[in-house]
């Protein structure tokens, strides 16, 4: 397996090559084949650390850094050579919250807390087109920004006291001509097509606070509408159907701590969440207990709420801090990293831990490039000796099996002979 992990303490990235069964916390377990620092430019530090990474067409590693730079590296170069840097015009306090690849348009999109969005056309590796800056409608900041992978040009965002909104950023294709046009800004006219409404007041008639942390679009959507999922910094997961009003159609409390990441598991009926404590868990969106949560209020009496079924936790390997970097690879493997400085990979279906590697740095993001284990090469002479030993071992086992069979036959024959002798003696007595 080959996994890239951000190194928050140094501003670089670590490449980890390991196989299933690797565990650096055990001396007698497999150890990583290699761990090396990459993407370390002069002046890289915690102030310019990498927060997000994407694998762009298996050709480039695109990284968004604190400070507003977007760096492009050659994935096919052994040392991940830096090929270009975009410096985006943002304030010193602004922070990137999302990095999205739109491969069909040769574009990446970077969103910032301030609501600024930059669209960057890589132009087939020429990097000669200037990024286009877009300001999202509204004055409140955002903490979540995601594209709809099933409909080009449609995005969703939300933040603290800024409920989820669906925005159409553009229509049609983002071609090279758009970036070269004098009126290119006119192509990107953000249009809010849906704004969510807060849930009803609680049993004490208090308004629930709003803080969106992540958003996901469902592939299946209603006619003339959208279906999407949000998580909050108050431990809730909510499902929206825009054809059924502005409030969520389902609202589940899944944990007590703020949810940091939200991902679909191997199907859209299951989600994986991580929080600011040490939770990484899989929940069902289809298996719901409508009265699982019960509490009693002096004014309202007994209160029941629906709860999404917990399918299991990714707890093998002992998470001891917030998990802030989560990557799903081919709907089969989940890689995690966070404050406890460990990289862990799990099988999504069984939740079995596949590898655990201590890196000594805090982690903001992880990105798996390859899930295959590299076989260790052996000299031909050693391989020949091993084959001979295996053949000899199999031959001995076969001989032992034959000897055991002959011994068993002899034993049965002896028993039969003894039985015959006993029967004859009885007949004589009679």
UniProtKB/Swiss-Prot annotation:
Involved in the biogenesis of the 60S ribosomal subunit. GO terms for biological process: ribosomal large subunit biogenesis; rRNA processing. It comes from the Eukaryota. Residues 372-382, 401-411 have a biased composition (Acidic residues). It is found in: Nucleus, Nucleolus. Belongs to the NSA1 family. Residues 386-397 have a biased composition (Basic residues). Residues 372-430 are annotated as: Disordered. It comes from Debaryomyces hansenii (strain ATCC 36239 / CBS 767 / BCRC 21394 / JCM 1990 / NBRC 0083 / IGC 2968) (Yeast). Keywords: Nucleus, Ribosome biogenesis, rRNA processing. This is Ribosome biogenesis protein NSA1. Component of the pre-66S ribosomal particle. GO terms for cellular component: nucleolus; preribosome, large subunit precursor.
């Amino acid at each position: 397996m080959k996994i890239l992990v951000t190194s928050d303490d140094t501003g670089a990235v670590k490449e980890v090559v390991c196989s299933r069964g690797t565990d650096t916390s055990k001396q007698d377990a497999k150890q990583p084949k290699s761990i090396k620092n990459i993407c370390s430019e002069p002046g890289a530090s915690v102030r310019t650390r990498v927060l997000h990474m994407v694998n762009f067409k298996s050709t480039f590693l695109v990284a968004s850094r604190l400070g507003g730079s977007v760096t492009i590296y050659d994935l096919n170069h052994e040392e991940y050579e830096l090929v270009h840097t975009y410096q985006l015009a943002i304030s010193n306090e602004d922070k990137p919250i999302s990095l999205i690849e739109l491969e069909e348009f040769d574009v990446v999109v970077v969103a910032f807390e301030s609501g600024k969005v930059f669209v960057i056309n890589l132009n087939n590796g020429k990097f000669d087109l200037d990024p286009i800056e877009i300001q999202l409608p509204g004055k409140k900041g955002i903490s979540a920004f995601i594209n709809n992978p099933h409909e080009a040009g449609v995005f969703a965002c939300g933040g603290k006291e800024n409920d989820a909104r669906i925005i159409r950023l553009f229509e049609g294709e983002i071609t090279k001509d758009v970036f070269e046009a004098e009126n290119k800004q006119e192509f990107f006219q953000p249009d809010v097509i849906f704004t969510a409404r807060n849930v009803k007041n609680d049993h004490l008639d208090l308004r629930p606070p709003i803080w969106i942390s992540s958003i996901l679009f469902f592939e299946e959507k209603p006619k003339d509408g959208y279906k999407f999922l949000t998580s909050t910094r108050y431990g809730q997961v909510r499902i929206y159907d825009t054809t059924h009003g502005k409030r969520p159609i389902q609202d589940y409390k899944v944990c007590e701590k703020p949810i940091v990441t939200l991902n679909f598991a191997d199907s859209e009926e299951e989600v994986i969440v991580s929080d600011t404590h040490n939770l990484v868990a899989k929940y069902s969106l289809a298996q719901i207990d409508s009265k699982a949560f019960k509490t009693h209020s002096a004014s309202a009496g007994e209160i029941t709420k629906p709860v999404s079924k917990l399918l299991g936790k990714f707890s093998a390997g002992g998470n001891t801090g917030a998990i802030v970097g989560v990557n799903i690879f081919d709907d089969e493997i989940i890689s995690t990293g966070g404050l406890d400085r460990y990289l862990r990979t799990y099988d999504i279906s069984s939740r079995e831990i596949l590898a655990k590697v201590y890196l000594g740095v805090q982690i903001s993001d992880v990105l798996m490039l390859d899930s295959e284990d590299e076989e260790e090469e052996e000299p031909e002479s050693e391989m020949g000796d091993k084959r001979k030993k295996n053949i000899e071992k199999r031959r001995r086992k076969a001989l032992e099996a034959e000897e055991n069979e002959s011994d068993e036959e002899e034993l049965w024959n002896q028993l039969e002979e003894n039985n015959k002798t006993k029967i004859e003696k009885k007949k004589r007595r009679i």
